[in-house]
């Protein structure tokens, strides 16, 4: 089970976007990277196509997961993630900072 998943709210720990929060749009587990909304924005030159207009566009670039921490559901601050097995045998993620369940 992964510590960070698609749809999670995360906080950037280091880099030029340090302190920013965003939602994980896509996980890339083989590269240990994540695409986060509004974080690590880069400008790209896009060639004109019949469907899309050309020009300089701004989009998110992948960021390494070591530079991300899950936002605590209680106060939004960065937290580490632990795992807990519930009575029904389901494995769930738990915020180490507050003890809150992250999923489930």
Curated annotation (Swiss-Prot):
Swiss-Prot/TrEMBL GO biological process terms: translation
Molecular function (GO) terms for this protein are: rRNA binding; structural constituent of ribosome
What this protein is called in its record is Large ribosomal subunit protein uL24
Report the function annotation for this chain.
Answer: One of two assembly initiator proteins, it binds directly to the 5'-end of the 23S rRNA, where it nucleates assembly of the 50S subunit.
Gene3D superfamilies referenced in this protein's UniProt entry, alphabetically:
2.30.30.30
Q: Which SUPFAM superfamilies match?
A: Translation proteins SH3-like domain
Determine the domain of life of the protein's source: Bacteria
